[in-house]
Amino acid sequence: MQFTKLFILTFFFVFTAKPLLAHQSECQEQLNSNFNRPCLERLIPRSLDPLNRNMMQPSVVKVSNQYSVSGSLTEDNQPLIVVIGASGRTGRFVLESLAKRDLRIRALSRNIAKASADIGGNYEWVYADVTQPETLVMALQDSDIIISTIGAKPGKGPDGPESVVYKGVINLVDEAKRAGTRHIIYMSSIGAGGAENFSTVFLNLFMNKTLKWKSLGEEYIRNSGIDFTLVRPGGLYGDPGTQGIKFDQGDKIIGSIPRGDVASVLVESVYNPDAINKTFEIINDESLPVDAWKDEFKNLKTGEYGKIQSGRLPFSYWGSMLILVLLIVLLIRRRRRRKRAA
């Protein structure tokens, strides 16, 4: 009798808990007619609904038409490229790659004296911290393109994922709109669009929901009205330029890639018009030619980015765990019956 009650309760929970755990979503209206994108379903975290819902509702503004409609550049122009996170391990490779082209470069860091001394180069170093929006006003002034390689440290606090890759991204995007920035190239990570991948669930559970905050930061950029390129690299390590680079969408692949290769893709996104308004993953693939990746941008689709993170354990995992518990209970009961019968 007790087992029957347990089964009924489990069945009720599995088939009724989904709407209780689910998040609300709604279509983000595209007010800018210059950006023809399909309706994007925007996640509305319940934790923000009663507090400050407008944090997930960036006002869509019209971007200046001073440049070409496609948003691409030719190397005859000298746009101002702002690199945020320039003194980081990936940001340094970005600066090195940009320095090979005829560009104006502004490097942002939270410790410009140390960064300038360690990295050198003919860069305009400016102090900026995405968690302090007032520091972004001068840092982004007159910027044409932003390349962001910012990352968060594990844990909570001012350097944690929520503060840096979510709220910090909101600060960055809002100031970029005021500054008239026309293209944001943002380094995210694989897993930000894989809502039910095991690795994503694991990192969200044990790394302070890192991928949830990255996913929501990505969505804020997508809904900003500014041209964007969201690059999701795999694990970062190794020497650049030794293997081919595989492009994919929908957050269905896993792998690794050197920081130097990631920087090359970020910088190429400045010039390639096929990179505009795309979200994609990149990993190394030894079966591909080393330089063939530059032709992959044209195969990417807009509006393809996987699933937006909620940070909660997916319903399928809850159901699987409950069924597993039920089976374990059933096995225990059978063993006890056999012992009694013996």
What are these regions (language model features)?
Residues 84, 108, 149-150, 184-190, ...:
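SDR active-site strand-loop-helix element
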Residues 145-148, 153-184, 215-220:
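NAD(P)-cofactor binding segment of oxidoreductase domains
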Residues 108-112, 130:
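N-terminal Rossmann-fold cofactor-binding loop
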Residues 124-144:
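Conserved Rossmann-fold cofactor-binding substructure of NAD(P)-dependent oxidoreductases
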Residues 90, 146, 221, 231, ...:
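Non-catalytic, hydrophobic alpha-helical segments
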Residues 81-101:
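N-terminal Rossmann NAD(P)H-binding glycine-rich loop of SDR-like oxidoreductase domains
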Residues 188-191, 198-200, 204-206, 216-240, ...:
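Conserved beta-loop-beta element that borders a ligand/cofactor-binding pocket
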Residues 86, 238-323, 327-341:
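Active-site-lining helix/loop region of Rossmann-like oxidoreductase modules
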